[in-house]
Amino acid sequence: MDTMDKLQFLCFEFKNFAKNRGPMSSLSQLEQDLKQFRALPYHSDTQLAQKLSEVQAWQRGRIHKTHQALFASANNQAMGEFLIDQLYGGEKFNVLAEQLERMVQKAEKLEKFIPANAVSTGAAGIIEAINAIKLDLQLAQYLQENHLSVDEPSMIKAYRSVNAESARRQQIADLKQMCYRTDKYLKSFILQKAFSLAKSTAYKKGFQPLYDFIAEGFAAIKPIKSIGAFIEP
């Protein structure tokens, strides 16, 4: 049995094993979120883009500081960096989103060689990153409109003024769910094998950005001994 036959067999077995939604619903949602992301005003406003970048940098520093003990563990460092870089990645995420916009038009081909749950998990992670940008953009807009710098007193004012507490709580809940889902699928030998075999095909078909994003998430979460201890307060 050659590599392609193995890949098709494992994907078939995984589809029988998995009962969750296929990739198309997740990718359809991702396509809509990418369109909304591209329409965000900071793409055409350099001053607002700079303010958002400063807000994201502040958020990265805050998270590193408040979770210093958690990230100090060697097993947790990779996942901590992955979450922070993806949620507050700035220009790095802009490049990824641009690549994904071109890729998602051909999304129906994905189900032929990448396990559905791996794709849906990757799509969920990107959607979470877009949601984080939307929330931080609200803060950046407030700071810009009120001519405030990005520091702790100003950020406290911005958080209170924007009053997006429920949206922030939902963001945390969705992020936890994504982490649990990723951890669950990572424990599946069938998914891991099928996903690994799909790499060369994914690259050849032009799906490298999404494949690499999923692979980075899997690699980051793998060393964690207890995902519950990592994400629950």
What are these regions (language model features)?
Residues 2-5, 16, 20:
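Intrinsic-disorder-associated, low-complexity terminal segments enriched in Asp/Asn/His/Tyr and depleted
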Residues 25-233:
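Extended, well-ordered protein cores
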